[in-house]
Regions:
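SF2 helicase catalytic motif II
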Residues: 129-178
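Conserved motor-coupling elements within RecA-like helicase/translocase cores
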Residues: 86-90, 100-124, 135-138
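A short beta-strand-to-loop transition that corresponds to the Sensor-1 phosphate-sensing loop
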Residues: 76-77, 120, 126-129, 145, ...
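Flexible beta-alpha connector loops of hexameric P-loop NTPases
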Residues: 98-106, 148-160, 222-224
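Conserved helicase motor "Helicase C" RecA-like lobe of SF1/SF2 P-loop NTPases
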Residues: 80-96
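Glycine-centered short loops/turns at secondary-structure junctions
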Residues: 67-68, 119, 174
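Pre-Walker A segment
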Residues: 1-50, 54-74
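Conserved interdomain linker/interface between the two RecA-like ATPase lobes of SF2 helicase motors
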Residues: 25, 168-224
Length: 224
């Protein structure tokens, strides 16, 4: 995009202050503690509607204040506009956010890549392939809805899983991997059970919203 701004790089306005509930604060503190000490991967586990994204955005905001960048992966291209708006409203004023997916034009991708190498991007929001982007001073890789099968590529080659690439990258860049979902994959659940991965749990929904009522109906008729 010679002579004009790259429309796939947004600037945050920081309009909304992130106020966490007590439950969210506990999860946020667990992530901060791991980042400050062991840098073990953390699983942010909470029901749909618990506000996991706000916990992650608050942590990303802290990293930006320290001069560190984040890569945030979502499973579907359709989710990027919604998250892009959230990032622009919640991240610190002036933070630069790059959007990366298969819909990003090649010219825009070149501009994003050059900006990443120059260290002028604070956060990347993208789908699976964004896991390979060269974020300067990487602080965190976050994979939202970690259990989703779209994070695994089998064809075309090379085959890879974004979760495994994230774990490898953070181990070589003094960063932290954070996974989030209401329904962890069996692989991550096993790592939590073995204490390879730490668990940051949010017990209920944000704003004291109630959980759905579950009923199991009888689908048979008694035999007489």
């Amino acid at each position: 995009f010679p002579g004009r701004a790259n429309p796939w790089i947004h600037t945050a306005q920081g309009r909304n202050k992130i106020d966490l509930s007590i439950a969210q604060q506990g999860a946020w503190q667990s992530i901060r503690d791991s980042y400050g000490t062991t840098k073990k991967p953390v699983y942010l586990w909470g029901p749909t509607g618990s506000g996991k994204s706000f916990v992650l955005l608050k942590f990303m905001s802290e990293l930006i204040a320290q001069g560190k960048g984040s890569i945030y992966l979502v499973p579907e291209i359709a989710l990027t506009p919604q998250f892009a708006r959230m990032f622009a409203e919640q991240l610190p004023d002036g933070a630069r956010i790059a959007i990366w997916s298969s819909k990003t034009p090649e010219a825009a991708k070149r501009g994003i890549y050059e900006a990443l190498l120059a260290g002028t991007i604070d956060a990347v929001l993208g789908t699976r392939s964004a896991i390979f982007l060269p974020m300067k001073d990487l602080g965190a890789i976050i994979i939202d809805e970690e259990q989703d099968s779209s994070f695994k590529q089998e064809t075309p080659s090379p085959a890879y899983h974004a979760r495994d690439v994230a774990l490898w990258r953070v181990g070589h860049q003094s960063a932290i991997a954070i996974f989030a979902s209401a329904t962890p994959s069996l692989e991550c659940y096993s790592m939590m059970q073995e204490n390879i991965m730490l668990k940051a749990k949010i017990a209920g929904r944000y704003g004291n919203a109630g959980m759905p009522t579950i009923r199991v109906p009888k689908l048979y008729r008694p035999q007489h």
